Amino acid sequence: MKNLHALMPACLLLTASAMAAPSNIGSAGDIHFTITIKAATCELENDSIDVNMETVVLQRPVKVGKELNQKNFSIGLKDCAYATKASVTMDGSPDPTDPSLFALDSGGATGVALKIKTSGGEQQYPSSTDSTPVEHTVWFDGTNKLNYIASYVPVKPDATVGTANATVNFSVTYE
């Protein structure tokens, strides 16, 4: 019995030290993190662009669909670090007669709409027509000009003269 009492504390000491020791339950694992850090994308040269369409003479008979007074304008981008593509969306009221064109502000000429296309001929549609943004290649050294052409387009044979202003908002996303 004395041997059993002496053996019991010795076993408890061995058990306690075994429980305190860390145990290896398998090999160590690795966690890999992947991240790309980019500088800010392009900045707009101007938040607002004014295009002077000058005076248009509406000839009779009106030629529906004929582009009048084409005027060049551009959206300027600068400091385009790491951006290779800019996608432009334009939002304005679609013309009720031809929703692929932008409506003029009310209170002026009627039966006339505004057409916007790139210098390469790709038309920019009002975003409310579920159009696809127009893509442009951008270069990260220097200033980029996204070149466009605006023109008035008669959409009705009984178009009337008057003020022909339009407001079109644009947004640019980058990749």
Curated annotation (Swiss-Prot):
Subcellular localization: Fimbrium
Family according to the record: Belongs to the fimbrial protein family.
SUPFAM superfamilies attached to this UniProt entry: Bacterial adhesins (SSF49401)
BP terms from Gene Ontology: cell adhesion involved in single-species biofilm formation
Protein name: Protein LpfE
Alphabetical UniProt keywords: Fimbrium, Signal
Pfam family, one: Fimbrial
Domain of life of the native organism: Bacteria
Organism in which the protein naturally occurs: Salmonella typhimurium (strain LT2 / SGSC1412 / ATCC 700720)
Main subcellular location: other
Cleaved signal peptide residues: 1-20
Gene that encodes the chain: lpfE
GO cellular component: a single term: pilus
